[in-house]
Amino acid sequence: VPYAAWLGQPGYLAAEVLLALLAGVHYSLADDTISALGTGCDSPTSTGCSSASWAMNLVFVVFGALQAVGAVPLLRQDAARARVVGWLWVVAGTFSVGVGLAPVDAHPTLHSLVALPVFVAQPLAVLLHARWLTTGRVRVSGTALGVAAVVGAVAFAVLLGADSWSGTAERLAIWPAKLWLPLAALTQLRSRRRAFGLP
């Protein structure tokens, strides 16, 4: 089950893009934040919001919970580094659930507080997971995704509140994890099969 939880993470990307396209108002993936998709629209002429905000908030909750559950095998390992990475994934996933439970239009301060750990823990989780727990091409790919996520998190902090490119920066911070997690899960599954002498 934990591995399946991570294998399904790219579904988050599909859900987010689909909801952006079906927002019912003018919404820009480049300029509007992800949280805006969880924000209800005051009128048909509103921008940077969604007519189906409940759906995006549900996506935050479901995929955040799956992300945390997928980290359970790491928490059970003896190596301290594996447990550190595991807890980073748990923190990022748990607070992602909080983002969905506290939409920015209903609870702006709480939303900001629960979103902040995601932008710290998740990029670090990708980068450290790749550097500490993988080798070869998987390590190279994960490191590239981790660096991109860190750059995105810093850029988003700088651009927060700007009229342009904040959505791009936020997605650069968040999306790499959704690409990395299935790769990490497959790597762990292969290692486990080898440990049991399976092909």
Task: Please provide the spans of the model-predicted regions.
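Membrane-interface loop-to-helix entry segments
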Residues: A52-V62, T109-L124, A169-L172, P176
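Interfacial/capping segments of alpha-helical transmembrane domains
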Residues: L21-S35
